[in-house]
């Protein structure tokens, strides 16, 4: 098989993973999502956002203390040319600004950077952010293993720990 045209990836143990690569290929066929990246003040979160930009899947709006962000980028060799940067005083401020941008519809998605989850969740759930609905907040993530042929989409492993039946109904509605 020609590796340059394959959508498969070999893992260290020789297994093949395909699901996430197929998902990424599908997403690349769509218009990029305008995504606020909240406080990407470490090389990992900033690099992930820039990788997604290079893949053509997002248009990042970086919200962080600008001086700190530029220092992280310089240290990691990351080029911020063409990125929209919104200066924020600190991580809490970045979360509040990002939530307001999402609430106003100026971005389509949020990506957590190097701030604590509770900081971001507090800003998202603040009444003035405009993001609350009548249903519970839920989340999901994609996980792939070598021993199963498709990726798993796992919801509420951390936010709704022991949901009631009514809360489970909201989780399912949100997932659909």
Regions found by a protein language model. Name each.
Residues 2-61, 65-176:
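Anion-binding alpha/beta catalytic cores of soluble intermediary-metabolism enzymes, centered on
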């Amino acid at each position: 098989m020609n590796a340059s045209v394959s959508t498969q990836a070999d893992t260290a143990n020789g297994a093949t993973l395909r699901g996430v690569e197929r998902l990424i290929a599908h997403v690349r066929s769509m218009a990029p999502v305008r995504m606020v990246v909240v406080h990407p003040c470490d090389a990992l979160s900033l690099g992930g956002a820039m990788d997604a930009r290079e893949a053509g899947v997002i248009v990042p709006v970086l919200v962080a203390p600008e001086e700190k962000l530029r220092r992280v980028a310089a240290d990691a060799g990351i080029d911020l040319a063409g990125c929209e940067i919104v200066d924020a005083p600190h991580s809490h401020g970045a979360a509040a600004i990002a939530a307001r941008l999402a609430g106003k519809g100026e971005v389509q998605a949020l990506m957590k950077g190097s701030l604590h989850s509770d900081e971001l969740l507090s800003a998202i759930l603040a009444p003035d952010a405009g993001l609350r609905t009548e249903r519970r907040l839920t989340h999901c993530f994609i996980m792939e293993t070598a021993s199963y042929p498709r990726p798993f989409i796992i919801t509420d492993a951390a936010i709704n720990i022991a949901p009631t039946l009514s809360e489970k109904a909201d989780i399912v509605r949100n997932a659909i």
